[in-house]
Amino acid sequence: TDQQAEARSYLSEEMIAEFKAAFDMFDADGGGDISVKELGTVMRMLGQTPTKEELDAIIEEVDEDGSGTIDFEEFLVMMVRQMKEDAKGKSEEELAECFRIFDRNMDGYIDAEELAEIFRASGEHVTDEEIESIMKDGDKNNDGRIDFDEFLKMMEGVQ
């Protein structure tokens, strides 16, 4: 399927080989599939930490025929999905750290003055008009300041 081709293109040959080795360890009968019960164990072995709820959701999505087993291609799709989720969570933590640094007075918001300070500190020359424009773009609820959710939305466009 398209999903399977996309999953393979996201991974290096080494990663695919590593995933295959882990998968094969649990494919006891060599039939080319593993049970959903074994799935969590394999994922943890490969450095993923899915919760019970995440595993249930993953299994529901991946085990389309309801057989209770997952083949290697379905497994690859699922691992890539999990890796992307983990990466997203990490970048959100990094953005939270940035937000705390920018929010000089620690009131939970970035105002125009704090935004201007950020640019000045980075050696970037920006006019008051540019600051105003950035504030207007980021301040979705028009309260004159940028909260964390607005900051995340702003940064999505940057990455």
UniProtKB/Swiss-Prot annotation:
Ranges of residues in domain EF-hand: 14-49, 50-85, 90-125, 126-159
InterPro entries assigned: CALM/Myosin/TropC-like, EF-hand-dom_pair, EF_Hand_1_Ca_BS, EF_hand_dom
Binding site for Ca(2+) 3: 103, 105, 107, 109, 114
GO molecular function, one term: calcium ion binding
Modification sites for N-acetylthreonine: 1
Keywords: Acetylation, Calcium, Metal-binding, Muscle protein, Repeat
An individual GO BP term: skeletal muscle contraction
Binding site for Ca(2+) 1: 27, 29, 33, 38
Binding residues annotated for Ca(2+) 4, in chain numbering: 139, 141, 143, 145, 150
UniProt superkingdom: Eukaryota
Record GO cellular component, one term: troponin complex
Pfam families assigned to the protein according to its UniProt record, in alphabetical order: EF-hand_7
Homology family: Belongs to the troponin C family.
Function text: Troponin is the central regulatory protein of striated muscle contraction. Tn consists of three components: Tn-I which is the inhibitor of actomyosin ATPase, Tn-T which contains the binding site for tropomyosin and Tn-C. The binding of calcium to Tn-C abolishes the inhibitory action of Tn on actin filaments.
UniProt miscellaneous comment: Skeletal muscle troponin C binds four calcium ions.
PANTHER family tied to this protein: MYOSIN LIGHT CHAIN 1, 3, TROPONIN C2, FAST SKELETAL TYPE
Name of this chain's protein: Troponin C, skeletal muscle
Gene name for this UniProt entry: TNNC2
